[in-house]
Amino acid sequence: MYHPQFTYGEPYRKTNPRSGCSTNYGKFERTGSESSDGRRYPGNVLFVPTVTGGIHPTQKPVELCEYFIKTYTNEGAVVADICAGSGTTAVAAMNTSRRFICFENAPSIYTIAAQRIEQARLAVTGGEKGE
């Protein structure tokens, strides 16, 4: 399953009416054209703000988790995170209308993550985004 998260730019239409000669294939006619309504497939580098002063030393941005969840799952799907840390994946799952199951081994981190997830649940229930 792949739901690309398109970016948008200027629409365009290009035509390449070139002909030429190739040592491998001989004479050729190239009359291909390209057009775009402005949608662009995602590139291979994502730019998202980093988390500073987070709950967990390796905390990821919610926006990054939302991107991957929207790209590789359907709404209503279950998202699993076996190393939940601060609960970012759970927050992102709620923000994108997915269910989640998370595991965290460290009791001190688990307690903080559970509080964060509950705050996010209340925000999402109230029509806002969890953070």
Predicted regions and their residues:
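Core catalytic lobe of class I
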Residues: 1-111
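S-adenosyl-L-methionine
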Residues: 115-131
